[in-house]
Amino acid sequence: MRNIKIELADKDRLRIAGVMSGTSLDGVDVAIVDVTDAGVVVKAFDTVPYPGPTRKELLRLCSGNSVDVADIAGLNVILGEIIAGAVIAVAGGAKISLKSIDLIGSHGQTIYHDPGGRRFRGRQVGFTMQIGEASVIAQRTGITTISDFRPADLAVGGEGAPLVPYADFFLFGRSGTCRAIQNIGGIANVTYLPGNGKIEEVLAFDTGPGNMVIDEIVRRMSNGRKSFDRDGRIAGSNQVDQGLFDELMKEAYFAKRPPKSTGRELFGAEYVDRLVAMAGGMGLGYEVMAATATAVTAESIAGAYRKFLPSLPQEMIVCGGGAHNRTLIDMLRERLDPMRIEPMDHFGIDCDSKEAVSFAILAYATAKGLASNVPSATGANKPVILGKIVPA
């Protein structure tokens, strides 16, 4: 029998397909990356959209409402097939042989995340669940797959999130410059890199909503014809309503101290239902709601920097879909002047590929037997190796 751990650990360079599907539920991001201890080279990246029915099923599973366990089990398998197909498609499109790929690092799709937990049979239990069956991915592609990265951090008292700080430090933390890596996906999260090269001083947490609330408002406004505010045009051509803004900024999550993480459970469809009802009572239209929600994302990020970071960074490097929202970026620049704010593209990594690249780096760490949670970010009581290895 092959000793996969030794086989992988002995290679200086690993070619890894990092796979991410985030809270926006847009589709499967695949980045094929050559990783060494010195850094990464991205060989291919693309997003494979979810089929419409699959996205609807995922939205239903992520709603927080009760669902049939058979639906979870079935979609776990189907999503494994979709992820495998996405890896095969992206590799084929880039003319990369599957045999040249050493590993797949798959985050899967989060359908529930409650690190604070609840009382369950007399115990306080924190939990997280990502689906996208790794055994299916490994068998369809013929590539050893690492998945289920979050539970190990929860098992040692952490939030199970954010996990990207290890990758942020790996990519950007050894420059000597104090930086913030600001991801704006469905949820917005920040990694604070102190500039002194010490990973134990890295901080990271979810600041609040990223694109999630804006996207849902735009979907409702357009009756599903649009899924996001392209370039921030809707927000940029409408006024922020101060009354609605003030009410939304009262959200308790914004004042909670890190470590903290959040998701669709807090800022999903039910949150938007309440926002729409509140705005309707004020006589406001969807366009003003979109502008105000954009301002809430900007202020929740800027406010978190002012309240929770040891010092204001010299640079903010922005990634995720929100990096394309010009209105949102302008709002951040206004609030955080004179901080330099630039998209990650300026540093050689596609804004949209960053999280998929991050899970390639996390898979690399696991293959090398390295702990890759950051306790100062997640609140864990010790560093641990993340993920489960499924041989092909």
Q: What role is predicted for each listed range?
A:
Residues 224-315, 326-339:
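A contiguous, well-structured pocket-lining segment that forms one wall/lid of small-molecule binding clefts
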Residues 2-49:
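N-terminal phosphate-binding or glycine-rich loops at protein starts, especially the Walker A/P-loop
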Residues 26-33, 45-60, 139-173, 180-255:
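Glycine-rich phosphate-binding loop plus the immediately following alpha-helix
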Residues 25, 291, 295, 345-392:
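Glycine-rich phosphate-binding/hydrolytic loop that grips phosphoryl groups
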Residues 1-12, 110-114, 120, 125, ...:
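Conserved phosphate-binding catalytic cores of ATP/NTP-utilizing and phosphoryl-transfer enzymes
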Residues 15-17, 178-182, 317:
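Conserved beta-strand elements of the Class I
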Residues 69-131:
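Short beta-strand-loop/turn "lid" adjacent to the catalytic site in phosphate-handling enzymes
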